[in-house]
Regions:
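Arg/Lys-rich, alpha-helical DNA-contact motif
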Residues: 2-12, 16, 30-35, 39-93
Length: 93
């Protein structure tokens, strides 16, 4: 799958590409995994949100987690990535 990071999708197209039902999409959205962007009064979803949801679904499937467990894992992975970036900056100084 090729993603363009300035690409935005409407909700129906987002669900189709992520292969999720509308109900499942709303759960991910409520959990903060999928965050919309409002442009010109329209709600859209950026491509990076699609990549994040695909990653979330893989984690959920691989580790047999529920939605909140998956959301927690994603948050922790993001925190680890930030800490690694900070560590790399300190190591380069």
């Amino acid at each position: 799958m090729v993603l363009l990071y300035d690409f935005v999708l409407e909700e129906d197209e987002f669900c189709r590409l992520a292969n999720v039902s509308h109900e499942e999409f709303l759960i991910w959205k409520d959990m903060g995994v999928v965050e919309p962007v409002i442009t010109e009064g329209e709600i859209r979803f950026p491509a990076e949100a699609l990549a994040k949801l695909v990653k979330a679904k893989k984690i959920q499937h691989d580790f047999e987690l529920d939605f909140s467990g998956t959301s927690l894992v994603l948050d922790l992975l993001e925190e680890i990535a930030l800490l690694r970036q900070k560590l790399k900056r300190y190591e380069n100084d």
